[in-house]
Amino acid sequence: MKSNRTFLHTPVSLGYESLGDASIPGTRIYVTPEGKHYPSITTVLGSIIKEGIEQWKAAVGEQEASRVLHHAGTRGTALHLIAEKYLNNEADIFSPNTMPHVKALWCSIKPVIDANVGKVVLQEAPLYSDIFGVAGRVDCIAEYEGTLSVIDFKTSRQRKTKDYISNYFMQAAFYAAAFYERTNIPVTQSVIIMAVDDDPNPIVFKENTYKWLKDLKQVIKTYNGNFSYK
């Protein structure tokens, strides 16, 4: 499938190419160029929903829970890769193994991307913050409706409201803060583009990144009080 848009890329140097990783069971740890060990933002935010996930597993059964989680992880990874290739102006964005339901999810969000995404600054880039003591990999930082934004592509089995995705907004706020720390370039907007199973109409959430920093700080503080990873 050939891209019908050409996206302009204006890369920004972070001062490093990649981050290292340390092996700690159950926790993703990044190692910064200075040798500091930071937990991933997904690990930190995952700690606040862990209890709810365990309750859900108990309710639906381990086998069904494993099936649903595997399906969600597979389709999410596949959609991210397609979006990354598309924004990189690659002609072939589907692999021979791309499933029909993933193509359907992509077709639902493609018009949103075409109509609103402008210059691309970063894609699938590692970021870390010495202020927060956390690291992670951002999906995309690009202009959205003319405003530099952290853009994340999500999938869901059903339509959601923003009350159910506060962790997404905190994640985006972290990426914005870490990017500013590394580049001194502010990113004030987060955009969550959510593709929904069997629904041609995606959901787009937009938030001010600064709005979620207070909640993010509290979650990190709680996580650091409960876990030791250094």
Q: What residue spans do the PLM features occupy?
A:
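Mg2+/Mn2+-dependent nuclease catalytic core
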Residues: 124-229
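Metal-dependent nuclease catalytic cores that hydrolyze phosphodiester bonds in DNA/RNA
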Residues: 1-135
